[in-house]
Each structure stands twice: as C-alpha cells, then as structure tokens.
Amino acid sequence: MRLEYLIRDINEEMYRKVSESRHDLSEEEARKIAKIIGLSAIKYGDLSNQASKDYIFDIDRFTSFEGDTGPYILYTIVRIKSILAKYQEQGKSLENLCLEEAQGASEKDLMRQLCSFNAMMDSACEETAPHKICAYIYDLANAFNKFYHETKILAEEDQKKQAGWIALLKLTKEVLETCIDVLGFSAPDRM
C-alpha cells in the first residue's frame, strides 16, 4: 500500500471515530482533529516497533483509543488538559504549584514513571531507539490513567493536596508532550 493511501485511510477511519463520539464538533473541526490523531496513529504505530523487526500495520489496532496506540496517548493528554482547564475555571492558577509527597500506590507509581524520563531519553537517543520512547509514554499514560481513576482530583477539598495533584498532572502532561514532540506529532486540545 502506498503511504498516501495509508494516510487517507487512517484519516478517514479517525474521522469516523471522532464523528461518532463527538456530535458537538463541526465537520471541519472533526476532520482537523482526525488528521492529528491519524498522524499519531501512523507515527506511533511505526515507531513503537523495533526498527530491526518486521510488523504488520493493522489499521484497526493502530487507530484504537485503547492499548498501546498513538490515539490512546493523545486521549490521555487531552484528558489531562481538560482537568487542568477545569481547575483554572475554578479560579485557581497553574503557576507556582508544588508536588506533594505521594500518598497512594498509584500516585507513587506515576511519580516513579516520571522520574525515569531522563534515563529513558538518554537510552533511546544513545541507541537510536524510538520504540523505547513509545514504551515509556505508554507506561506513563497507564500510570496516569490508574491514578486518575483512583483519585477525585477536582473534588478534593484539601486545597494543598489538590494543588499537589494538579502539579503532578501538569508535569505528566509536559513529559508526555515532550515525548510525542520527539516522535514527531502533537496532541489536539480536545477529542
């Protein structure tokens, strides 16, 4: 299959998925978002495999919003952006936030994942191994999503604890965005 046909097919598949899940988007906005997600599906799908190994490009698997895929990573980033925006809508600032000592297991796991960023980037660059970046951001996205599902971030009444969690989310978003930038794609503001 020619690359131009693959891109076209992926973009159409992503447009179909975005249109089905987001009826509030105009066709133009849905196509724009689908194009961003489609690019992530192609690049992440390709780069997540070791360069020395063959693989089958499975459109259904690579365009899924679940599992080790570009769309899943983007969905995680968009979820974090949404939480940060809602925090700001409450009249709170994202500036001068400090991480707090981790309390729960999922919070500790997320912090541990973030701490391994520099070592992972050094290794990926030294070995010219973008699949290591993909593996890292998948693990980081999983760690964030577990933390998110176990924690009522915006409903937390302890302001210091909530601000610490928001600082953790902000850092997670920055690391994920740095990684996808290195891989050559970006995240939309909403999906």
Label for each model-derived stretch:
Residues 1-191:
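Non-catalytic interaction-recognition regions
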